Regions:
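ABC ATP-binding cassette signature C-motif
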Residues: 1-147
């Protein structure tokens, strides 16, 4: 994700940055709409966007690439809580593996993780998805060793 953010072409529009031969303009605009870019917003130059808007373009671009593995390092850093909630739901349709580093438990829950590795005291502990319901009550690790 960070690489995609750095590779956005600043002098091109949002639509041009996510353009792909695999998708029609309608499909691209629909995908961008899922990341809160509507109507003529898609014709804005990337250089005019806020950091949060650039993050949304990069995340949309990542999902459109159909990679089988996504590595996301703090993908919600530049997003307000309402936008995080909307954007997080877009990852539910992704069928590959997502490795995400995040301090945002609500985003992690939204993207539908099945396992979580947490570093509560400098060592990795693995927890089940149910931990998200009791995020601040970290008492029952499934495993405390790295496999």
């Amino acid at each position: 994700y960070a690489q995609e953010l750095e590779l956005l072409e600043q002098d091109r529009t949002i639509l041009e940055n996510v353009d792909s031969q695999e998708y029609s303009e309608w499909q691209l605009r629909t995908a961008l709409g899922n990341f809160l870019f509507y109507d003529n917003d898609v014709f804005k130059k990337v250089e005019t966007l806020s950091p949060g808007e650039k993050a949304r373009v990069a995340l949309c671009k990542v999902l459109l690439q159909k990679a089988n593995l996504l590595v996301l390092d703090e993908p919600t850093n530049h997003l307000d809580p309402e936008t995080q909630e909307i954007i997080g739901g877009n990852f539910n349709v992704y069928t590959g593996t997502i490795i995400v580093v995040s301090h945002n438990p609500s985003f992690v829950e939204q993207i539908g993780i099945s396992r979580m590795l947490i570093l509560p005291s400098g060592r990795i502990e693995e927890y089940s998805r149910e931990l998200l319901e009791h995020y601040y009550d970290i008492n029952t690790p499934i495993c405390t060793d790295i496999c």
